[in-house]
Amino acid sequence: MYKLASCCLLFIGFLNPLFSLPLLDSGEVSLQLSAPHEDAPLTSEELERASLLQILPEMLLGAERGDSLRKADSSTNIFNPRGNLRKFQDFSGQDPDILLSHLLARIRKPYKKRETPDCFWKYCV
């Protein structure tokens, strides 16, 4: 019984984000496809998208060698976790690993020394 209830709650929990999406009536919205005009100049958004598509194969091939993040241009909006860590270090003034170890140290219980050295586990001599 508990397993069934927990499965239902888990299923509803996964469906919750789907229920929050707006639903559109298909009769209200008509499908509009626009053909690209070859004579029209490209906008900056289209140029940026084209440059990202050109960089993508290079990044995928470079990921095997591990040098893809070095080749990526800083003007592209590609997530770089090491760059974000450097920004965090500049902002906070300390290494994120040190901060994490301090946070975890507060959670741990302090080690208590035994009062009597004659006792081992729960057996005392």
Swiss-Prot record:
Signal sequence extent: 1-20
Per the UniProt entry, the disulfide pairs are C119-C124
Q: Propeptide positions, renumbered to this chain?
A: 21-111
A cellular-component GO term for this protein: extracellular space
Where in the cell? Secreted
| Pfam families xref list | Urotensin_II
Q: Which UniProt keywords apply?
A: Cleavage on pair of basic residues, Disulfide bond, Hormone, Secreted, Signal
What family, per the record? Belongs to the urotensin-2 family.
Q: What's this protein's name?
A: Urotensin-2
* Organism of provenance: Macaca mulatta
